[in-house]
Swiss-Prot record:
Active-site residue numbers: 689 (proton donor)
Record pathway: Amino-acid biosynthesis; L-methionine biosynthesis via de novo pathway; L-methionine from L-homocysteine (MetE route): step 1/1
Amino-acid positions noted as binding L-methionine in the UniProt annotation, renumbered to this chain: 425-427, 478, 593
Origin species: Streptococcus pneumoniae (strain Hungary19A-6)
Family the UniProt entry places it in: Belongs to the vitamin-B12 independent methionine synthase family.
UniProt cross-references to HAMAP family, sorted A to Z: Meth_synth
E.C. number(s) listed in UniProt: 2.1.1.14
Cofactor comment text: Binds 1 zinc ion per subunit.
Record key words, sorted: Amino-acid biosynthesis, Metal-binding, Methionine biosynthesis, Methyltransferase, Repeat, Transferase, Zinc
GO terms for MF: 5-methyltetrahydropteroyltriglutamate-homocysteine S-methyltransferase activity; zinc ion binding
UniProt-annotated binding residues for Zn(2+): 636, 638, 660, 721
Name of the featured protein: 5-methyltetrahydropteroyltriglutamate--homocysteine methyltransferase
Length: 749
């Protein structure tokens, strides 16, 4: 039996790629130095996979920014505005992901969306009327050659043509079918070039096949692959799926002339049932049996029981998806062995795949025995008081009174805000000084008194600055917080925190998800100190800033021994206690961020409510259901597809919601109007994920577009996300323009 993985993390064991790339962005190193460092990192990663005994090693799973963007660049799906920039290929590539503002021009970044139900974000290409799809890049060939020079005949990985078309945007007047022939020709050119270089197999990632597919989408898939596979140029083709099962196309899929198919046996509800119904003897089945999205040890007995039921003659063991969704290795962690033994990060998952292969081949008895022992006893006990509190919840605990319309009138009278009130999402830039002071405090080099004095001074500066430019609702800036989930988790029982458990989120940005180890309760007030301090420094309202229970759950590595619903309700009660303490301390506007609400929405619509929304939305309502009617509840949501769950979002019963919608051209506005959305809304008037400052008139035009779709009394003016990662000069310049644009728009009402 052979072993492989779908893909490997890119940032490096210690986020080397992130830090090197950021040096390049700051012009501290050259393009050549960046490319050389990336080449060294790839070699290191391939060597790790090889030394762990994995027999089939992927290549081109590495990316300087995003693998979907890589595919767009490879196939020339690049807007003319970027094509025409007098920049190097690498500079144009980064301009697509980050935007560009300089002497050569000014272009906005492409939109960014969540990658299925993960916290990874992909860059969304756009097919335009004049898009000429052709083979234009060489990264996939360069990296195959690099590996070959190291003595490795790798399996290049590429986004499949169906998923590429399904997840891209299209200019009005063009559609996916228009590009089938040119895209197939470009893929076949890739096949031919790889075959020339000595490749024997290519992996085409078709995650879009695990979603609900219409008849038209199935027809598109079959049209693409019937044409593509008519001439494979001598390559074997592995069609790889993940994040679910392929029930809609299984019968068609197994009859295609592909050589191998990869299935997800972790998240694929019906995968085992499908393959037990029959799998062709002339194809190889890649069994994704080791979870690529969570960090818990694999239960070998359970995995072996699944594998024994697979009727395929030729099986390759693999991960359920790319390992980029988990941290690099547990080797650098400082947990006690009794805790650490329960975790497997990317490198350790290589061991698990190898172990399972060995056990199936009659070896690995010691590994199996050790694994059995690990799962023989309960890992953690229960909090009986918490379980009783949850059991005692009734419908009234999830209902806020009075109803929204009455609260809206009460709050209008209480706050007396102008039309189109201005605010920010919460965080301000975390400078080197802010991070250095936090680190010094954590190391004991700065006393509590000294650290508090620094935070108070920083908050004072930003409160005064917000007053000076005439913001309406202020924020304290979150300078005391390292991360919007970790900061809360550190004040909750049941949480563990890795030292180096970084996972790529978008571009070079990493997040360090905490681990939910046991039952979750609040240990002490978390945000009251600094929120109430900030409110004491101004007569204007200052928002209290909390992370919501669904987002805390979704941006953590969840337990597998209880349901995510039960874990979320535990977190909801902890955050509810914090909301009530903030209210009692005089904080009358409280933002409960649900940035990741959409993230764990099942990929199939039939599962949306029963498996997720029926408990996720009530969990949010539980948090704020008992606040007074004159306390205003805000929430915020990050890049995602929201249009299909607008009624559920309205049902959260917040008073104000802000979306990250500016980068996607405010597409959500039409749906808000169509669904008669009642909650007040701040769609975001500029994109903070790009370092560019919005041009004169740009924010004015965005506000005008918003007001064309949403009644002015319902509209808030804000950036599309927090400003933690931005620089101070660009932040201040952008926010001054925002306030000026809001005032100008008020005069036109």
């Amino acid at each position: 039996m052979s072993t492989t993985i779908v893909g490997f993390p890119r940032l490096g064991e210690f986020r080397e790629l992130k830090f090197t790339t950021e040096k390049y962005f700051r012009k501290e190193i050259s393009e050549e130095e960046l490319l050389a460092a990336a080449k060294d990192l790839r070699a290191k990663h391939w060597n790790i996979v090889k030394e762990k005994g994995i027999t089939e090693i992927p290549s081109n799973d590495f990316s300087h920014y995003d693998n979907f963007l890589d595919a767009a660049f490879l196939f020339n799906v690049v807007p003319a505005s970027v094509q025409n920039l007098d920049l190097s290929d690498l500079e144009r590539y980064f301009a697509l992901g980050r935007g560009y503002q300089g002497e050569k021009g000014d272009v906005r970044a492409l939109p960014m969306k969540k990658w299925f139900n993960t916290n990874y974000h992909y860059i969304v290409p756009k097919f335009e009327k004049d898009t000429q799809v052709k083979l234009a890049g060489h990264k996939i060939f360069d990296e195959f050659q690099e590996a070959k020079e190291l003595g490795l005949n790798t399996r290049p990985v590429l986004v499949g043509p169906f998923t590429f078309l399904q997840l891209s945007d299209f200019e009005e007047g063009v559609k996916a079918d228009d590009f089938v022939d040119s895209l197939v020709a470009a893929y076949q050119e890739v096949f031919a070039k790889l075959a020339e270089l000595g490749a024997t197999c290519i992996q085409l990632d078709e995650a879009a096949l695990v979603k609900d597919l219409t008849a038209e989408e199935k027809a598109l898939f079959l049209n693409l692959y019937n044409k593509l596979l008519a001439d494979k140029k001598g390559l074997e083709v592995l069609l790889q799926t993940y994040f679910g099962d392929v029930r809609d196309v299984y019968a068609d899929l197994v009859n295609l002339p592909v050589d191998a198919i990869g299935f997800d046996f972790v998240e694929g509800k019906k995968t085992l049932e499908l393959v037990k119904g029959g799998f062709p003897a002339d194809k190889t089945l890649y069994a994704g049996i080791v979870n690529g999205k969570n960090i818990w040890r694999n239960n070998y007995e359970k995995s072996l029981a699944v594998l024994e039921q697979i009727p395929a003659e030729n099986i390759v063991l693999t991960s359920s998806c790319s390992l980029l969704h988990v941290p690099f290795t547990t080797a650098n962690e400082e947990f006690e062995p009794a805790l650490l033994n329960h975790f497997a990060f990317a490198v350790e998952k290589l061991d698990e795949i190898r172990d399972l292969d060995a056990i199936r081949n009659g070896q690995g008895s010691e590994a199996l025995a050790a694994n059995k022992e690990l799962f023989a006893t309960e890992r953690v006990g229960e909090n009986a008081e918490l379980r009783a509190r949850i059991a005692g919840l009734t419908d009234t605990d999830y209902t806020r009174l009075p109803a929204f319309a009455e609260r809206e009138a009460i709050q209008e009278e209480a706050f007396k805000l102008p039309a189109l009130p201005t605010t920010t999402i919460g965080s301000f830039p975390q400078t080197k000084e802010v991070r250095a002071k936090r680190l010094a405090y954590r190391k004991g080099e700065l006393s509590q008194k000294e650290y508090d004095a620094f935070l108070a001074e920083t908050i004072d500066e930003w409160i005064k600055w917000q007053e000076d430019i005439d913001f309406d609702v202020l924020v304290h800036g979150e300078f005391e917080r390292n991360d919007m989930v970790e900061y809360f988790g550190q004040n909750l029982s049941g949480y563990l925190f890795s030292k180096n458990g970084w996972v790529q989120s978008y571009g070079m940005r990493g997040v360090k998800p905490p681990i939910i180890w046991g039952d979750v309760t609040r240990l002490n007030p978390i945000t009251v100190k600094w929120s109430s301090y900030a409110q004491s420094r101004t007569n204007k309202p200052v928002k209290g800033m909390l992370t919501g229970p669904v987002t805390i759950l979704n941006w953590s590595f969840p337990r597998e021994d209880i349901s995510i619903k039960d874990s979320t309700l535990q977190i909801a009660l902890a955050i509810k206690d914090e909301v009530l303490d903030l209210e009692a301390a005089g904080v009358k506007i409280i933002q409960i961020d649900e940035a990741a609400l959409r993230e764990k929405l099942p990929l199939r619509r039939s599962d949306w409510y029963e498996d997720y929304l029926d408990w996720a939305i009530p969990a949010f309502r539980l948090v704020h259901s008992t606040v007074a009617p004159d306390t205003q509840i805000h929430t915020h949501m990050c890049y995602s597809e929201f249009t299909d769950i607008i009624p559920a979002i309205d049902n959260m019963d917040a008073d104000v919601i802000s979306f990250e919608a500016s980068r996607s051209n405010l597409e959500i506005l039409d749906e808000l109007k169509a669904k008669n959305f009642q909650t007040e809304v701040g769609p975001g008037v500029y994109d903070i994920h790009s370092p560019r400052v919005p041009n004169e008139g740009e924010i004015d035009n965005t506000i005008e577009a918003i007001l064309a779709k949403v009644p002015s009394k319902k509209v808030w003016i804000n950036p599309d996300c927090g400003l933690k990662t931005r620089g101070i000069p660009e932040t201040k310049e952008s926010l001054i323009r925002l306030v000026e644009a809001a005032k100008a728009a008020r005069e036109k009402l």
